[in-house]
Regions:
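Short Gly/Thr/Asp-enriched flexible loops that form oxyanion-binding sites at enzyme active sites
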Residues: 78-102, 274-283
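Conserved phosphate-binding catalytic cores of ATP/NTP-utilizing and phosphoryl-transfer enzymes
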Residues: 109-130, 309
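Short glycine-rich phosphate-binding loop at a beta-alpha junction
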Residues: 70-80, 260-270, 292-295
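A short helix-loop
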Residues: 2, 8-9, 16, 26, ...
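N-terminal beta-alpha supersecondary unit
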Residues: 2-82, 111, 115, 236
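Glycine-rich phosphate-binding/hydrolytic loop that grips phosphoryl groups
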Residues: 115, 294-333
């Protein structure tokens, strides 16, 4: 079964074709990230306009790369939540028109479910149940994936997202957008123990908070500038990355130990962070658990992950009609 996946929840306009939820046929991404970088982050209006400009050609290119036409596709899957609402609506409305015109089923896909499904593309042998840390520009979650379309949230971000914290710290340190790769690159030559950053405390054993950590970095930099001192950018980047990776890994591994989970996954943009991957791998080895990590190309937003999850949503009977609307927020375990 061939699924066309369409993604437009943030600043990537993406389309892909995936067979049976696990086998990539084509994958095309058009991004406005360079334009967004001029403003130090995503400007929703710019993102929406670029989606409207790029989406038709992006979908056409995905079909062309697969040597297919829309008639060869079995269903059209699209991100409908969560995300920047203007951006989401571009993808949803395009997918509705395409599916209706071609007489194909329309499959709504939750963006974070898509991130989890990116693991199926890298590891076709992976099957639920497993425990997954989803960390991205949106809320982080520790999720028990009980079945292909059944989820139980154990922990979540209570304030700022991990990706958002990376972007804010990058701006504070004068590093370019997007913040995740910039901070990681700067951290390579830094001392992760130079700055003593706090570990935020939060209610809920598996919940995470990054607002205080982000503020601590901003204050440290501001105070140094007020004193006329040089900010050690590489050391601050390394110290921040170490703290955020330690927090996320510790929560995931604690949940794994408490639930006796023997299969762990990472998903989302922050899953590309090398230090986080290392900490999770090391901790899982001590627990006797196996870790599955998505390829770096699947960590950011892409259409392939939406097509992959779209296959399982379709098999589960999650078919939408033309009343489908985009949503800015929606729990991953919605039903």
């Amino acid at each position: 079964m061939y699924i066309l996946g369409i993604e437009s929840s943030c600043d990537e306009t993406a389309a892909a074709i995936v067979e049976d939820g696990k086998h990539l046929i084509s994958n095309v991404i058009s991004t406005s990230v360079k334009e967004q970088a001029l403003y130090g982050g995503v400007v929703p209006e710019i993102a929406s306009r670029r989606h409207a400009e790029y989406i038709s050609a992006t979908v056409q290119q995905a079909l062309q790369d697969a040597n297919m036409s829309i008639a060869d596709v079995d269903a059209v899957a699209v991100t409908f939540a969560p995300g920047l609402i203007g951006a989401v609506l571009v993808g949803v409305n395009f997918a509705k028109g395409l599916a209706y015109g071609a007489g194909k089923p329309l499959v709504p896909v939750h963006h974070l479910r898509g991130h989890i499904a990116a693991n199926y593309l890298t590891h076709p042998q992976l099957e639920p149940p497993f425990l997954c840390l989803v960390a991205s520009g949106g809320p982080s979650h520790i999720v028990q994936v009980e079945d292909w379309c059944k989820y139980h949230v154990l922990g979540r971000t209570v304030d700022d997202a991990a990706g958002e914290a990376f972007d804010k710290v990058a701006r504070t340190l004068g590093l370019p957008y997007p913040g995740g790769p910039s901070v990681s690159q700067a951290a390579k030559t830094g001392d992760p123990h130079y700055y003593k950053l706090p570990t935020p405390h939060v209610e809920g054993k598996y919940n995470v908070s990054f607002s205080g950590l982000k503020t601590a970095v901003v204050n440290e930099v501001h105070n140094a500038q007020q004193r006329g001192e040089e900010v050690r950018v590489a050391d601050m980047a390394a110290s921040f990355q170490e703290r955020i990776a330690q927090i996320l890994a510790k929560k995931l591994l604690a949940a794994a130990a408490d639930t006796n989970a023997k299969t762990l996954c990472l998903a989302g943009g922050v899953a590309a962070n090398g230090r986080l991957r290392q900490l999770v791998n090391d901790g899982a080895q001590k627990l006797g658990a196996k870790v599955y990590l998505p390829e770096l190309k699947y960590c950011g937003d892409n259409g392939a992950m939406i097509a992959a999850q779209g296959y399982y949503e379709f098999k589960d009977g999650n078919i939408a009609d033309l009343t489908l609307n985009g949503l800015p927020t929606l729990a991953i375990d919605y039903r």
